[in-house]
Every structure is written in structure tokens, then in C-alpha cells.
């Protein structure tokens, strides 16, 4: 009788817990996170008047969360989601789960270096590391007061061999050394928006060592001219996304750069906002990269006229275009083809976004009303013509 009573008190259902399979018992016991059953739950399993016994320690977590391979996949999934959402600190919550999750998360964090504070970057550079880190992603975000010596000191602890993405957002006073980029042959993405030090000489020296580069972001790098872009186009054949938009020194980027990119790489996204691109350059772009182009930014391109954008859209030279930016183009007045193109894409169920300034938006609305009236009047004219032909 006492043996049966002991079995009942120690049975899993007596505490309201799921039964752990025998094969998983060893793995659960070996888990570093083994919380004990609350006392009130354990006491509820005994009969009234019997001595209260403490329930044995049992794991509340599922056995799959103790498998390192599965934990690594989960942590990487969280890392990818936090990167897309722009919340790099979301991954830090995984550090607090248990020892296994902490170890896996630290390994993933060592592959992704993100700094939004210059003081923390200096602390990282001054800390004693056990060997060099080999991350895949290095991001510096809005470190406007960061000095070049601080960046050089930090990069001494970062090996470039496994580097895939290097992004320095609004870090105007620092520049990755050309020698460092020379050892980053696997780099896929280089983003230096708002950098005042990027020049043609830097691009000419660096692009030779970046044959696998796919994305180049040089927004607001107003010292770059056609010469630097031509060098990048001829040395980076896998390039598919280029952004050269700027507010100053637009005359340094002309149709020469656009033609070089069109002839040497297969562009999918091109941003030349504020550049002196002409109608001829846009025609060359459409002739070579028209089918592959998906996003095109032409804001503040003052030399474009009705002979390029409307005519090319009328000919469906960009069949897969989904984003078209046309703000502040003073010589663009005929927007009928633009409106028809947008209506055709919507009728086909294809996503399309055509952005314009206030003037162009007003022209779009007027042209849409005109087309609506013409479409409504067309059946009436056809019916009247049919009736007249029947009377004759």
C-alpha cells in the first residue's frame, strides 16, 4: 500500500506536468535550465493528513530546446527578423534563456557587429580580445564624431576574410582603409551614405579587390564622379543595386556613369536622384537593362524631358518596373503615358509605385480624369457609329 501511495505522489499527473518520454529524460536532466516545480503544486498532489514531500526536480522546457542545432536555427531566425525590423537589440533577449542559448547567441552576435555609439566602439577597440573576430556584418550607425584612428583601432580586431556586409551610415569622418577592403574579397554589400571622404581614387583602388560586390550605396557622397562609377562598373560584374543620389555636385554624375553601369552590370535598382542624367543616358539604360530594372529613382534630374520617361513607358521599355520616383523634374509635362503605364500595371495585378512632386501629382489626377471621360465616351461613339451603319 505504501509503495502504491509513493507512486501516486510522484506521478507526473499529480503535479499537472506532461509526461516526459523515457528517451528524453536523460537529455532533460542534462539541460542547464531545470526549474523546480512550485511547492503549492507539489503539495496539491498529496492526500489530506499525509506528510508533505517535495517533488523531484523536473524540466518544464521541451527537449527540442536543448538541441544546439535547433537552438542555432532559432537564434538565427530571430537575428534575421530583428535586422529587417531595425531592432538590433532584439537578439539580446536570447542571452537570458539558459546557458545553451547564451552560448549560441554569443556565437551569432560575434558574426554581427553593430555600433550606434562611438563610446562603445572605442571600448570595443580598447578591450582585450581572445583572437580576432570574423563577423559577416559590420554596421556603424550615425557616428558623426567618430575619428579615423578609432575605426582603424577597432578594425584591428575584425578579420575581413568572412565579411559580407560593411555599412557605415552617416559616418562622415571615417573611411574603411583600402588595404582592409583589399582582404575582403567576399564582400557583397558596401554602404557609405553621407560620407565626405569617399572619392574616385578610393573607389578605383578598392573596387579592384571586390569582384563579388552586389550592392553599392553612395548616397550623398558628393565627391564621387563618373570616373569612380566607371571603375566600379568595369571591376564589379555582379553589381545589381547602385544608389548615387545626392543634393550637391550633381554635375559630377552624368549619363556617362549610367551608360557604363548599363553596359557592364545587370542592374535591378538604380538611384541617380539629383544627377545630371540626360534623355540619351536613359534610353541607353532602357535598351540594355530595361527588362531587369525593378526600381528607378530620377528625382531632381533637371535635364530629363518628355522625350525620355513618357516615351519609354509608352513603349513598355521597363516591363518589370515596380518603383519609379519622378519628383521635381521641371521639363516633364506630358504624363499621359505615365498614367497609362500605372493603370496597365494595376489592371494586370502587378505592384507599382509612381511617386511625384505636388505639380506632377496634380497632373496625374487631371490626366486620370481625362482618360476616364474618354473611356466613358468611347462606347457611346461606337454604339452611335454602329446604329448609323445599320440605318445605311
Swiss-Prot record:
One of its GO terms (biological process) is cell division. One of its GO terms (cellular component) is nucleus. Keywords: Cell cycle, Cell division, Cytoplasm, Mitosis, Nucleus. It is found in: Cytoplasm; Nucleus. The keyword Cell cycle applies. CDD domains: AMN1 (cd09293). SUPFAM superfamilies: RNI-like. The keyword Endoplasmic reticulum does not apply. Negative regulator of the mitotic exit network (MEN), required for multiple cell cycle checkpoints. Required for daughter cell separation and chromosome stability. Involved in copper sensitivity. Belongs to the AMN1 family. This is Antagonist of mitotic exit network protein 1. It comes from Eremothecium gossypii (strain ATCC 10895 / CBS 109.51 / FGSC 9923 / NRRL Y-1056) (Yeast). The gene is AMN1.
Amino acid at each position: 500500500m505504501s509503495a502504491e501511495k509513493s507512486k501516486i505522489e510522484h506521478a507526473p499527473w499529480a503535479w499537472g506536468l506532461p509526461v516526459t518520454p523515457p528517451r528524453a529524460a536523460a537529455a532533460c536532466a542534462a539541460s542547464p535550465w531545470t526549474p523546480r516545480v512550485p511547492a503549492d503544486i507539489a503539495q496539491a498532489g498529496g492526500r489530506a493528513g499525509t506528510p508533505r514531500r517535495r517533488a523531484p526536480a523536473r524540466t518544464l522546457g521541451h527537449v527540442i530546446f536543448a538541441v544546439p542545432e535547433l537552438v542555432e536555427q532559432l537564434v538565427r531566425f530571430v537575428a534575421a527578423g530583428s535586422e529587417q525590423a531595425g531592432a538590433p537589440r532584439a537578439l539580446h533577449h536570447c542571452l537570458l534563456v539558459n546557458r545553451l542559448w547564451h552560448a549560441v547567441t554569443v556565437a551569432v552576435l560575434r558574426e554581427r557587429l553593430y555600433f550606434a555609439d562611438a563610446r562603445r566602439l572605442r571600448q570595443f577597440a580598447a578591450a582585450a580580445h581572445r583572437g580576432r573576430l570574423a563577423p559577416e556584418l559590420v554596421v556603424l550607425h550615425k557616428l558623426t564624431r567618430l575619428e579615423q584612428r578609432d575605426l582603424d583601432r577597432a578594425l584591428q580586431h575584425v578579420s575581413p576574410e568572412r565579411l559580407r556586409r560593411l555599412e557605415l551610415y552617416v559616418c562622415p569622418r571615417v573611411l574603411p582603409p583600402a588595404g582592409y577592403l583589399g582582404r575582403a574579397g567576399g564582400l557583397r554589400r558596401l554602404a557609405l551614405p553621407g560620407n565626405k571622404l569617399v572619392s574616385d581614387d578610393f573607389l578605383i583602388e578598392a573596387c579592384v579587390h571586390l569582384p563579388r560586390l552586389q550592392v553599392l550605396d553612395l548616397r550623398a557622397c558628393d565627391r564621387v564622379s563618373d570616373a569612380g562609377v566607371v571603375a566600379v562598373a568595369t571591376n564589379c560584374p555582379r553589381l545589381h543595386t547602385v544608389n548615387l543620389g545626392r543634393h550637391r555636385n550633381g554635375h559630377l554624375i552624368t549619363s556617362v556613369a549610367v551608360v557604363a553601369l548599363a553596359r557592364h552590370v545587370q542592374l535591378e535598382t538604380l538611384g541617380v536622384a539629383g544627377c545630371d542624367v540626360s534623355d540619351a543616358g536613359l534610353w541607353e539604360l532602357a535598351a540594355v537593362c530595361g527588362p531587369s530594372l525593378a526600381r528607378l529613382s530620377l528625382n531632381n534630374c533637371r535635364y530629363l524631358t518628355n522625350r525620355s520617361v513618357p516615351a519609354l513607358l509608352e513603349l513598355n521599355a521597363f516591363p518589370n518596373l515596380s518603383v519609379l520616383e519622378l519628383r521635381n523634374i521641371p521639363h516633364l509635362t506630358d504624363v499621359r503615358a505615365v498614367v497609362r503605364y500605372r493603370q496597365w500595371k494595376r489592371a494586370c495585378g502587378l505592384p507599382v509605385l509612381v511617386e511625384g512632386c505636388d505639380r506632377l501629382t496634380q497632373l496625374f489626377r487631371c490626366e486620370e480624369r481625362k482618360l476616364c471621360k474618354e473611356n466613358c465616351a468611347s462606347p457611346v461613339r461606337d454604339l452611335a457609329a454602329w446604329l448609323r451603319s445599320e440605318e445605311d
